[in-house]
Amino acid sequence: MQVSVETTQGLGRRVTITIAADSIETAVKSELVNVAKKVRIDGFRKGKVPMNIVAQRYGASVRQDVLGDLMSRHFIDAIIKEKINPAGAPNYVPGEYKPGEDFTYAVEFEVYPEIELKDLETIEVEKPIVEVTDADVDMMLDTLRKQQATWKEKDGAADAEDRVTIDFTGSVDGEEFEGGKASDFVLAMGQGRMIPGFEDGIKGHKAGEEFTIDVTFPEDYHAENLKGKAAKFAINLKKVEERELPELTEDFIKRFGVEDGSVEGLRAEVRKNMERELKGAVRNRVKSQAIEGLVKANDIDVPAALIDSEIDVLRRQAAQRFGGNEKQALELPRELFEEQAKRRVVVGLLLGEVIRTNELKADEERVKGLIEEMASAYEDPKEVIEFYSKNKELMDNMRNVALEEQAVEAVLAKAKVTEKETTFNELMNQQA
């Protein structure tokens, strides 16, 4: 076997391989012998068909199959010999085959980039230092009460957290615009659903009033014809409602799985959940900075084949989220996913190199801890832990999570890490 390797462009490679004629003929004869043992031809007993007849009838197809098999096997031998690491499926380019002559063909493919991690010491990471305070727990209890609140109609003016029912008609330069009109529209104030200034214009008005508010659409508004435009909205305020928050009664508290129904028990459960959420948020915040720094410090070429493969994964995930099928997934424009796919491939390659250079393996104690932490959010943690322990795929996924965490820690060990005190709300708002 003769092999030559050339770089076509970037990560592209072209391997040219020549297979000796006698190797081909030996393989063809061997396969024809196997065929002769199995075929049935009228006038001959099974296994007794003369080889010249077998060759005459099956020679062309056997030769084609043998060539395909030899091309594949010789390519594998070639990349092992040349220490080449292909990324994605190879493209075979057959040459012209002439019986009795050597056969030359080419294989085109991309290789993984050679990565030499650099400048890890320049990566800057700010680690949030946060404690869950009594005030944070109070705020979370208020949020829980608001989620369970009922609405009661009131006579007074609309406030920042009231709910209003309105009719409205919007216009720009005196002309109504598409999507700018609604009847019996229910708006819970304070949630940021409307454009800036809209809710402020409603505050202070009472049910039964009709009025006009002036607003300006943001420059980044989704409708091109409305970006940055001044608009007027004619409002008919039909109803104003205020929240009625439930008291922290025993029955109310038991809805959240606190068996004794006590306020102290609810506060303890809320604090535990907040601390678990906080731990994950700090971990994600630090991880995202470390990965961002790793990517910025190491500019690498990415095989197009890996990006294409990742785009297909993202397409299928998107289709599943919206109830689509395989065919619909592949019809989604690749441009929607290309940037995200490239980013995921780059991160995967760089973290893979961190794992390789540091000879990391998944720490089983860490895997166990991750599963226990995740299971603690469920009603029966033991059942969840047992379910994971019996499912190889889930365990492998969790090992990958642990290994990625270990890789991030290896990056952090060389990075410049500073600590910054912050509050629970500030950190959670950054995560949103």
From Swiss-Prot:
Enzymatic reactions: [protein]-peptidylproline (omega=180) = [protein]-peptidylproline (omega=0)
Enzyme class: isomerase
Keywords carried by this UniProt record: Cell cycle, Cell division, Chaperone, Cytoplasm, Isomerase, Rotamase
SUPFAM superfamilies, sorted: FKBP-like, Triger factor/SurA peptide-binding domain-like, Trigger factor ribosome-binding domain
Pfam families attached to this UniProt entry: FKBP_C, Trigger_C, Trigger_N
Cellular component terms (Gene Ontology): cytoplasm
Residue stretches making up the PPIase FKBP-type domain: 161-246
InterPro entries (alphabetical): PPIase_dom_sf (IPR046357), PPIase_FKBP_dom (IPR001179), Trig_fac (IPR005215), Trigger_fac_C (IPR008880), Trigger_fac_C_sf (IPR037041), Trigger_fac_ribosome-bd_bac (IPR008881), Trigger_fac_ribosome-bd_sf (IPR036611), Trigger_fact/SurA_dom_sf (IPR027304)
Gene Ontology terms for molecular function: peptidyl-prolyl cis-trans isomerase activity; protein folding chaperone; ribosome binding
Known EC number: 5.2.1.8
Major localization class: cytoplasm
Record text about domains: Consists of 3 domains; the N-terminus binds the ribosome, the middle domain has PPIase activity, while the C-terminus has intrinsic chaperone activity on its own.
Self-association state and partner proteins as the record states: Homodimer and monomer. In vivo most of the ribosomes are in complex with monomeric TF. Uncomplexed TF, however, is in a monomer-dimer equilibrium with approximately two thirds of TF existing in a dimeric state.
Role noted for this protein: Involved in protein export. Acts as a chaperone by maintaining the newly synthesized protein in an open conformation. Functions as a peptidyl-prolyl cis-trans isomerase.
Designated name of the protein: Trigger factor
Species the sequence originates in: Escherichia fergusonii (strain ATCC 35469 / DSM 13698 / CCUG 18766 / IAM 14443 / JCM 21226 / LMG 7866 / NBRC 102419 / NCTC 12128 / CDC 0568-73)
